[in-house]
Amino acid sequence: MLPSARIEAVIELTAQVAHSLGENGPAADVLVRKYFSSRRYAGSKDRRRVTNLLYDIIRCWGFLSDISGSDPRRMVMAELHLSDDDPKKYFTGDTHAPENFSDAELEFLETVSAGKEEHHRLNYPKWLESKLQDRFGDKFFQEMNALNKRAPLTLRIARDAPKITEYLVDKKIQYEKGIHANSAIIIKDQVQIRDWPIYRNGLVEIQDEAAQLAVKYVELKPGQQVMDLCAGAGGKSLAAAGYMKNKGQIYAFDISENRLKDLKVRARRAKHHIFQSFVLTPKNRSAKLGEFKEKMDRVILDVPCSGSGTWRRNPENRWRLRQESLGEYINIQRSLMKEAWDAVKIGGRVAYMTCSVFKDENESQIEWFLIEHENANLIPIRKQGIEQLEGTLQLSPFSRGTDGFFVAILEKQAIKT
């Protein structure tokens, strides 16, 4: 693709993202995959250039849509202009290139300058300002700038670490070891790993270092009975199986059959065989979970949340979040915490996790739970992140170079009579 054709592709995808944000439709990565699946002539460099520019636009969506009236052409023009890349060389009207500027668009371009309001400069919805400032305090600017950067590709070593490093060195792939989790490898190059033998054969999995560290604090051991109540595609379950050395049982629950199918594929690839998976529905949920009442040594509870800690890799999430949906998440989280508590045995532990930086979803939920359950004891986690409820862990991009992630470990004690 010629450079001007790439810009035309970005305009088309920007329009699709705008529609998707308005209708709560598919995520940007889904739209990009679909777009290029019907354009086989586009090479890997084309896809990378288009995707990178599109995601730069998504990060600044609030500001760009405000100044452009949500017009996709103007949003792309403005992003190019603000990046010191002259848009006039792309908008030529040539074959496969965007049409020439209209007089109105030329006038618009002359008015474009960097955002002056804080929520425009730091790329967050205005209504979230107090929550973000409450969380980050005097590190607000540093943390928000970190959330605006692209996240690196982080891998978890599943097995055979020497083979992994040998492969990376042989392929001249730049990497460094994680700082917080021994299992983490951070890839410095922009790569596609789906065809790597070490990935296809289950030696590595894609997982942010924060999530790897969170599983470490669950203190898993061989032979335990473990429930993953919101398993999804099984990232944390697979990490748990490694700590358990394939001994014991992991019961993976989710409301999505497709996600659990992914877990089964990944488990086979990683040579883990201690999984049982269960699809939960409104009809079977109570009865199915009732079968596990007070039988679990550990419950991993990575609850649905705002995803505010993942804005580096999912920048559109900041624009999808609505005030009412945050309240819904909080109610869902409390319901799931009760279900997890019913499943864990006396002396067992629930590991509450979110990929959020908001106190409403993190410390406030733990404080509520401790008040509601007199037999719940908060097991202290050594402080490694930013300011937080004593005994819990809150990681963030600036403080620790990871996704924003929260962990609290709750131990179930016998009720005193």
What are these regions (language model features)?
Residues S256-E294:
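S-adenosyl-L-methionine
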Residues A233-N246:
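Conserved SAM-binding loop of SAM-dependent methyltransferases across substrates and taxa
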Residues E129-S130, I255-D262, N317-K345:
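Glycine-rich S-adenosyl-L-methionine
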Residues M1-R194:
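Class I Rossmann-like S-adenosyl-L-methionine
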Residues M244-K245, V344-I346:
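Helix-to-beta-strand junctions that scaffold the AdoMet/dcAdoMet cofactor pocket
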Residues G223-C230, Y251:
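Conserved class I S-adenosyl-L-methionine
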Residues I187-Q225:
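SAM-dependent Rossmann-like transferase core, predominantly class I methyltransferases
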Residues K283-S306, R312, G327, R334, ...:
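C-terminal catalytic and target-recognition region of SAM-dependent MTase-like enzymes
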